[in-house]
Regions:
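Acceptor-binding helix/loop patch of EC 2.4 sugar-transfer enzymes
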Residues: 39, 46, 107-152, 221, ...
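Membrane-proximal helix-turn-helix segments that form the acceptor-binding/catalytic region
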Residues: 64-71, 93-100, 104, 130-168
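A short, active-site helix/loop in glycosyltransferases that binds the activated sugar's phosphate group
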Residues: 117, 145-188, 233
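Conserved catalytic-core segment of nucleotide-activated headgroup transferases in glycan assembly
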Residues: 176-254
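Acidic donor-binding loop of glycosyltransferase active sites
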Residues: 264-277, 290
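Short hydrophobic beta-strand element within catalytic cores of glycosyltransferases
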Residues: 291-300
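A charged, aromatic-enriched C-terminal amphipathic alpha-helix characteristic of glycosyltransferases
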Residues: 333-362
Length: 362
């Protein structure tokens, strides 16, 4: 098949392209590089802001100068309802252009959108980065983020894309929960995040030493979305009760290759407080045998049909700090528990997230 992937979210489309290409499909990836990630792409949609508003013309030129690749595809998958770095009105026009000139359009449910915020405000899922304990939370920190997606032109764009796509694909259980409504259920599919799994020799069982090495990735401007510093405070509290047994390293802004080496060396990674399920960052750690503190709700394991593996130290914002600390402490200091979770982490990523298996599901 001839396939066009538009937009990028944490290398999802790049990794999927590799899997689809290996299966014999002809795949083109068109994106702006996902901001600072600067991920690879075949058609570059990045705006050169030296040109101000005129930089949008460059984006349109790059699209229309590649019409043989942009048109006539069997499948076009959009990473979100806005998929080119232009305002909502232009995204709306581009959606209808792609729908008219290609056979099938898939909307990816991979990121923020107006419906996601509407569902979160109604308590779906039970907790998120904007809602827990039956009420909205973090609203001041999230005000601009929500505003960006709820302006009238963006709501109209979302409506056109969501209601007129041939299918919707959610990459996370919480996104699937939000879209599993009578309006979308018949067209909705869950397909997990694709990953290039490191060779078996790159993974090692963690938690074997006397000292537990904990890695905390810091994103100060985004911590209201992730909650990593709150989890780190839980770990610090546990560390004070066990002097000399826990070593915590904070890291910010290191190159990707160095960060991967740090994941290899760590026993435990602090990830996200507000998520139900593992993120791409979590999966990169788990594939290396590093145990993750983050989202691993039983509802998620039941949803994917996993009866045995429970590799994640599950923390959540809607319980007390003391309960979260107890969960971490038990995982760290119950004999053999970290090693078991490390083994299960490797098995879990290979079972559900190998990019070749994910490409087959697509």
């Amino acid at each position: 098949m001839k396939i066009l992937l538009v937009g990028e979210s944490s290398m999802l489309h790049n990794t999927l392209k590799k899997g689809l290409t290996e299966r014999g499909h002809k795949v083109t990836l068109m994106s702006d590089g996902n901001d600072w990630h600067d991920s690879p792409r075949d058609i570059d949609l990045r705006r050169n802001m030296r040109w101000g508003k005129l930089s949008g013309l460059q984006v349109l030129w790059n699209i229309f100068s590649n019409l043989p690749k942009v048109c006539g595809n069997d499948i076009v998958q959009l990473h979100n309802y806005t998929f080119v770095p232009l305002l909502g009105g232009w995204n709306r026009i581009m959606f209808w252009f792609l729908k008219l000139t290609n056979k099938r359009i898939i909307k990816g449910c991979f990121a923020d959108d107006p419906f996601l915020f509407e569902q979160q405000a109604a308590g779906v899922p039970a907790y998120s980065d904007t809602y827990w304990n039956n009420k909205p939370q973090n609203m001041e920190a999230n005000r601009q983020r929500i505003f960006e997606h709820t302006r009238p032109q963006f709501i109209r764009c979302w409506h056109d894309v969501a209601y007129n796509s041939d299918a919707l694909v959610a990459c996370l259980y919480e996104y699937w929960l939000c879209y599993n409504t009578p309006r979308f259920a018949k067209r909705l599919h869950y397909i997990p995040l694709p990953m290039e799994i490191p060779h078996e020799s790159s993974a090692r069982i963690k938690g074997m030493g006397r000292t537990i090495k904990v890695l905390v990735g810091i994103q100060p401007k985004r911590d209201y979305l992730k909650g990593a510093m709150r989890i780190a405070s839980f770990v610090e509290s546990v560390a004070r009760r066990h002097p000399g047994r826990i070593e915590i390293e904070y890291v910010e802004g290191v190159p990707y290759d160095k960060y991967m080496r740090m994941l290899d060396e760590a026993d435990v990674l602090v990830d996200q407080l507000y998520s139900y399920t593992p993120s791409m960052n979590s999966l990169a750690a788990m594939a290396r045998g590093t145990v993750v503190i983050g989202g691993g709700e039983n509802d998620y394991y039941n949803f994917i049909g996993e009866p045995k593996l429970r590799p994640i130290i599950n923390v959540r914002p809607d319980i007390s700090d003391g309960e979260n600390e107890t969960t971490i402490e038990q995982a760290f200091f119950t004999e053999g528990q970290l090693q078991r979770m490390s083994r299960q982490s490797i098995e879990f990523t290979r079972k559900y997230h190998d990019y070749r298996c994910v490409a087959e599901q697509y």
